[in-house]
Amino acid sequence: MSMSTRELGGSLPVENVQQLAAASHNFKDIPNRYIRPELDNHVVVDESLQIPIIDMTKLCSDEQSKGCLDHQELEKLHQACKHWGFFQLINHGAAQVIEEMKVVSEEFFKLPLQEKMKCGQLPNNIEGYGQAFVVSEDQKLDWGDMLFLMSLPVSLRNMRFWPNSPPHFRPTLHNYSKELHKIAMRLFSMMAINLGIEPQKLTSAYEDCNQGIRMNYYPPCVHADKVIGLTPHSDATGLTLLIQINQVQGLQIKKDAKWVPIQPISGAIIVNIGDVLEIMSNGEYSSIEHRAVINFEKERLSVAAFHNPNMTTDIGPLPDLVKTSGEKYKRLSHQEYIKLVVASKLDGKSLLDHMKITH
């Protein structure tokens, strides 16, 4: 059972930010919808903290086995998921497809606007080139453009939104999608072991998962401190795997009421726990609020791969994890949950708060 992206709703059309940035030379050139006086710039940015680094070669060689090569690394993964919600994954075996994805991402965003708009968003559709989560005409906007594509299952791919230019874009994204799903499945297996359940209890929900790929372009801004690339939020997904294209710093996570900049490691995949995995783990693992800030002089590019359970899986705590403490989160059908996500604007962890059971 699947659900077309047209059934989910969409995002309202807005001005192209890359073009807007090229024409903005001072503060008055920036439309008011992008100025964010509510930004919590008073919150301390702590550059001394760093998210954990996980070496995938030290995790289990056999996804179905509990005989791990390095129990210490497995515990390190567990603590990262519990207390950080973010980690950088190294030695993951996907270096080649990542480099190829970086090339086509940069080439796509360098195309003339007219060419990029050939795969522009359509009314009531979340896919395509534009902006996401714009649900009202008076909503404040993010300083960035994106291309969002459904990549898995293959039956959900709408090739109308898959660029023909650059010419090697489609096969590159196909290979990238496949390899990142393999990595996500291995991580889900390790997480299940850490949660004390059989891997299949978690991985079965993601074997035919819904995977979406979002390519992000954040242009520089003459008043970078007055705009935001991506509004503070937690991901509404199960697991997000992100690569930073040009190593320009901009991703920050909120840890202990402080914003922590993520220092990009060349070739690493940044992994973060989404709201769905927090719900499925019954709160054992935590999604975390994060944002993208803008650079005064340099553009920043990234590619995020979002992994959600298949559409037959209800969104709720796994039965094996509620025996002692009871369910801490509501249970929705996947269709109900996705409709809730698409109808919501990015706003901290408000979506997850909606799912919590209050006594």
Predicted regions and their residues:
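Peripheral, non-catalytic segments flanking oxidoreductase cores
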Residues: 1-359
